[in-house]
Each structure stands twice: as C-alpha cells, then as structure tokens.
C-alpha cells in the first residue's frame, strides 16, 4: 500500500495526492438555494422602516399573554379562596384537593376571560390601524381599548358597555403612558 505523504523532504510533509471531489466540475446553484436572508424582505422601503407586528403576530401575542396572565392571577385568587374555605378537622388530602380544585376553576375562568379580551383588543387594534391607513400610534391603542371594552360588555346593556368602554380606554391610555415613561427613564 502506498503512503500518500511524501517523506523525502525532511520534516515538511507534503501531500502527493489531492482528495477526490465528485462535485468539482458540476456548477449547481445549490449555494444560492441555501443562503437565505436573515432579515425579512419588504416590497417597499416604507414597510421596512416601520417596526410593528403583523396582525397575526399581534393577535397571537395579546391572546397568549392575556390567557397566561388571567390563568396565573386566577390560580392565585382561587388558591387563596380555597385556603379560606378550608374547615377545621379536614385532613391534608382534602385541604389540598379543595385548594387545587378552587385554583384550577378560577384559573380557567380568568384565563379564558383575559384571553378573549386580548383577542378582541388585537382585532380592534389591527382594524383601527387599517382604518387609519397604517398609522400605528398611541391614539390607535386608546381607540382599540375603548372599542374592546364596549364590545366585551355590549351584551350586558348600554350603560355597562359605556362604563366598560371608559375603563378600557383609560387602561389603554395608562399602558401608552407607562410605555413612554419606561422608554424615557429605563435604559434598555
């Protein structure tokens, strides 16, 4: 068997033979196929300069965070209610069962409630942004909060819908103001 290394030049080892590459003469554009861009592509420069979520991402974000937040807050509230409802003389198993059942029941209700509010808010915000020709400002968020409150409590009557709309508008205004304060004073 022949040694592929030439040892005749002393300490320098030179390779006599090169490794066979079956694709050397084939010029396929496979490199271009797998060299994908890392940033999103836009048709117009105006789209690239705006930093906002698409309507689908917006919908997923607000619905998911609403459900998770409602579930955590509901579980906490249900656990406290389960602890308060415990009676003297109950065994540890029964107390634990009562706490878990109460926490799970309230967590489901809270998660579904805030998840549906998040879904409505995301839909309203995307709709208001579309109606305002893509202007995604603070006024859009406040209008979406107001409309979400009105829509959420519309089945309870007009007075309840107006109050819920005011609460939604104030909550959205507080969120916008809080976001500006955080941007100004918190170095991120």
From Swiss-Prot:
Expressed in roots. Detected in cotyledons, leaves and flowers. It is found in: Mitochondrion inner membrane. Keywords: Membrane, Mitochondrion, Mitochondrion inner membrane, Transmembrane, Transmembrane helix. Pfam families: Tim17 (PF02466). The keyword Transmembrane helix applies. InterPro entries: Tim23-like (IPR045238). GO terms for molecular function: transmembrane transporter activity. Its main location: mitochondrion. It is a multi-pass membrane protein. One of its GO terms (cellular component) is mitochondrial inner membrane. The keyword Membrane applies. Belongs to the Tim17/Tim22/Tim23 family. Component of the TIM17:23 complex at least composed of TIM23, TIM17 and TIM50. The complex interacts with the TIM44 component of the PAM complex. This is Mitochondrial import inner membrane translocase subunit TIM23-3. It comes from Arabidopsis thaliana. The lineage of its organism: Eukaryota, Viridiplantae, Streptophyta, Embryophyta, Tracheophyta.
